[in-house]
């Protein structure tokens, strides 16, 4: 009877499929997680563990999620899961930012701008909830585990009340004041904008040089004659020349500013005498196409107080001094309109200049303003320029392209406009201050010093922003927002003396009824007869205040969480957004940051490094990736990319990610298949009885796990994925598993050589499945179920794998890792010779070869120590080893084996057919099949 020896091999199978089919399998796994209430189970088993709190920066509840949202949520999920596996209680409470103009704008687009305010708020609330539901489903589809049933929403009544209470604390600590200052103003929004709501884009603007005539009397010496010690003929007209890219602001001009320490030249030209900064004189004359002669020079300080005639308004303005003046462009003399610029405002305060804005909120000049009354600001540019040209005050006009602030929502240029607003002061504190004895800026800068940054360059960036930022304008003139619940005296324009008490009473009402409680409130309910002297403030809070105070409204209120958080994680734009607003409110309330560490990730760009935009057609939606390739592919791409810079994505990049995933999946499948008949309880062996290469790989895997825990701890996920991929493809696939196949397939099923291998594979796969779980969450769960655990169990209910006999592993690591590292190097040299022989047609496969190795010294001793097991390491049928005196004599020769091929193990051996009953087998296979089985010590 002919024996089918293939059936005698240990060729096991697994239900873990080769193809992931992730797009189909993942939704079913999500459903199972929800039905088993996995997140709640994680919380239950984590009770009593040390906490790790990653506080979710709330995305805005408007529109579908994009690839940047996916990157952000996946990074957070990787951290939460790795911390859970590390033995922390790491809850994740997702949140949404719900108030603000973008949502209100959507309602206006759909219903028009004339709805009653209460109806607008009602529609905004409903719209925000719809957007949250859509975004939530998309985030969950990415495999992000969290308290999705109880997210925090800034429009929740309790949080709206908490925001008002946070405002009260900042007020009590003396950081809040009302002032009329220039703020970023969006004409389309009809409201002030926060710094974080401003984007800089290129804009073409008129750049003009304008002469302000220095006033002198014809019958007396010109005032500049004494200042500059110059002879100035009677009747000479002298112009102080300014340069500006905003001609429309000239109606608001109140002064011309010079730097007190710069040199200024009086220059005689055919257009009159001009006053210019000395360093810029030649450039200015070239621009004006004029010849000129410098008559005299002086320091800017000497010019202070000179009177100038406004070029078209009926008023006299003064020369003032300011250190914000630069010589980078222009003339060195700065047109100063305190209503339209912060530098102008601050210097104007020093000189008592008015800062009333002639421009209304709709971008039009007040009717009473001469020349441009009722005109839109951008149209006023041409009128101003034509007027200056006609009057002879225009020395030059051109159009330039420069970086200019735009509204982040409307993508339109903004203006700077002085309006009565409420500010959180960076330097000042009110007389009622109960704060920490330092300015808010100093508190914030000290808090930055105490914060850890990932990557490290984030510290300098945030420090620079805090060091240079103006006071924070927190008031807005919109409907859909948390109201600034202040009562203002109608005549004195001061806050009610019982403001802290009133704020708490209003917060109590809002907690029950939402923000509508304030808007519908009759002041007499709280003020009684005093109500006739007070009016309710109708301004709402900047939405950055909403999200910036979640450390008060969420971290301190949710019993799952803790203040301060261990980590805030957002995109790099949040240095001027949520990171900063949270820092400022945290310092204003508690004197410290609400976080101990900040992690910043870059923006997503296409394969060529271009920003994604619908107009370019290079947008890749995360929903499409999940629905076609699977969320685990998206997660693997995120984790594989160094998030500290830009993250590139394209179809080609995703294709490479899929290939990486396949290699990992195939490795896992091999491990699972070869553990199909393994039961740890029955088949466990103490490592001392294992084959040496198995002990080596156990020690190597333990060292790998230790390294990866470090990568996870330092948030270096791309390093972790690179190491894991290399481990699967090179350490396992290219080395260990390649060697192991012979022993797994041909040794006795219950023999020590095979069980030794399976013991090692058991620990390797249990380590790997956990190490991959934070990244490949769906695949890790699929592997976990295949390992035979309970259907109710999950990899996320466990911690990192605990290896057996830790002390023995450590000892093995010190000895076996360097020993086998050298063996792997020598093996690589032999494999190259085998491959060359195969390419040249000398052999068919490595098993058809005899390898002759001449080695010297320690290398000979190392190879010789393996005995006959060396052939299994080299995956060849026969090895002849010979000692030589030195490296010069070392050689590797490959020849074709003259022996017969064993039908079962495919080795070419001299003893094939030595047992008549199994005439096509080698003696090793006969022993494994019908005898006591082979013995392996090393491989």
From Swiss-Prot:
The keyword Aminoacyl-tRNA synthetase is annotated on this UniProt entry: yes
PROSITE patterns membership: AA_TRNA_LIGASE_I
The organism's place on the tree of life at top rank: Bacteria
Cofactor binding, note field: Binds 1 zinc ion per subunit.
Molecular-function annotations in GO: aminoacyl-tRNA deacylase activity; ATP binding; isoleucine-tRNA ligase activity; tRNA binding; zinc ion binding
Binding site for ATP: 614
Enzyme Commission number(s): 6.1.1.5
Binding site for L-isoleucyl-5'-AMP: 570
Domain description: IleRS has two distinct active sites: one for aminoacylation and one for editing. The misactivated valine is translocated from the active site to the editing site, which sterically excludes the correctly activated isoleucine. The single editing site contains two valyl binding pockets, one specific for each substrate (Val-AMP or Val-tRNA(Ile)).
Name used for this protein in its record: Isoleucine--tRNA ligase
Lineage of the organism: Bacteria, Pseudomonadati, Pseudomonadota, Betaproteobacteria, Nitrosomonadales
This protein's encoding gene: ileS
